[in-house]
């Protein structure tokens, strides 16, 4: 494929947003799109295909690749707990296999997020200096995730900052 093959093409642009829930009809199939306010970005979506029992969770539930905490960690943990009650046979995560069983497929992400939160709370209570706290927080998750060494220190630092500001 060369430049001539894509000349005149355009990337589709969203023409509407989702607040609450919205149903999209795709011929004989309907997808239910639900806004998740407290997820990894603060403006995430869950898509349900009731016909196949599939939830598309995207970055709400990364798999194998370390979650990137850039919004409300407590809200993300709570959102995953609420979502665990959603009826589904499988989920399609971000950065992983095509499908995972539900709700068990969310366990590693929930474990990591909870570990970061609880460890950060402990280090704050101890008065641990930030550089040392960043090394201790979530240390038990090292080796379980792709890009741990690259992403995790930032997750720990952002979590410490957010908890100290509360």
Which positions does each model-derived feature cover?
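Metallo-beta-lactamase
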Residues: 1-36, 41-42, 50-51, 80, ...
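Divalent metal-coordination and catalytic microenvironments
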Residues: 18, 47, 59, 76, ...
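Active-site metal-binding loops of divalent metal-dependent hydrolases
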Residues: 38, 53, 59-60, 95-97
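Short active-site segment of divalent metal-dependent hydrolases/proteases
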Residues: 43, 62, 98
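Surface-exposed cleft-lining segments at the edges of enzyme active sites
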Residues: 62-68
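Pocket-lining segment of extracytoplasmic ligand-binding domains
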Residues: 63, 73-80
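Divalent-metal (often Zn2+) His-rich catalytic cores of metallo-beta-lactamase-fold enzymes
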Residues: 77-128
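C-terminal regulatory/interaction regions
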Residues: 125-166
């Amino acid at each position: 494929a060369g430049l001539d093959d894509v000349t005149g093409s355009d990337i589709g642009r969203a023409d509407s947003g989702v607040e609450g829930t919205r149903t999209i009809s795709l011929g004989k199939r309907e997808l239910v799109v639900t806004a998740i306010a407290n997820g990894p970005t603060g403006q995430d979506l869950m898509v349900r295909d009731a016909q196949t029992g599939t939830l598309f969770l995207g970055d709400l539930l990364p798999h194998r690749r370390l979650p990137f905490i850039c919004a409300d960690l407590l809200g993300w943990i709570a959102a995953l707990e609420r979502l665990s009650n959603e009826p589904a046979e499988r989920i399609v995560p971000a950065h992983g296999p095509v499908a995972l069983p539900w709700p068990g497929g969310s366990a590693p992400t929930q474990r990591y997020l909870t570990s970061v939160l609880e460890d950060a709370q402990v280090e704050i209570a101890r008065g641990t200096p930030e550089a040392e706290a960043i090394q201790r927080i979530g240390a038990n998750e090292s080796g379980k995730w792709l890009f741990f060494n690259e992403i995790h220190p930032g997750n720990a630092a952002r979590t410490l900052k957010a908890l100290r500001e509360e």
